[in-house]
Amino acid sequence: INLINSFLLEKNRFIFESVEKGKIKGRYTIFGKNPDKIWEFNNNNSYLIKDKKKIKLKEKPQKLIEDIIEKFKFEIPSGLPPISSLISGYFSYDSIRYLEKIPNSCKDDLRIPDVRLLRPRTLIIHDNLKKKIYYIANVFNDEKIKDYTKKYFEIKTELLKLFKQSSTKKF
């Protein structure tokens, strides 16, 4: 419980349960955080949020979403859960307008993007079947890492911080 509470305190984090058809409980519970990229799509416009900067992109949402998915295909190392790296987010009902021409007669009360996708660097995966927890620190091909030793120690520090947070009792 402490892990869940401490995990959800910051923005751009999520919990995902991998429920399969006919099952009550999923095999994996995935906690994601620390996205290096966030894509937002709204009113047929595309945006990339990276390093706290929001940049308008030229590509239309449908094409860009297809490209994101295509570029994200890679092999998961053996011994890790098949969901050890992912793109997470949501597609609103309004996103159907990227595929079909239907009128937009609804008022935008929520003022949230039609689609929001994030690529988390950090995943904590609980394998409910094997009763194991995996800490995944993703390093993506398009990241420009100059010092891998420094990156290793950053990941190690983050893991130790997480252990400390999850073992601290909160009343």
Please give the residue ranges for each predicted region.
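Extended accessory regions or peripheral subdomains of proteins
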Residues: 1-13, 18-55, 98-171
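Extended, highly charged
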Residues: 55-62
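FAD-binding glycine-rich core of flavoenzymes that anchor FAD
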Residues: 62-80
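Extended, Lys/Arg-enriched charged tracts that mediate electrostatic binding to polyanionic substrates
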Residues: 74-77, 81-110
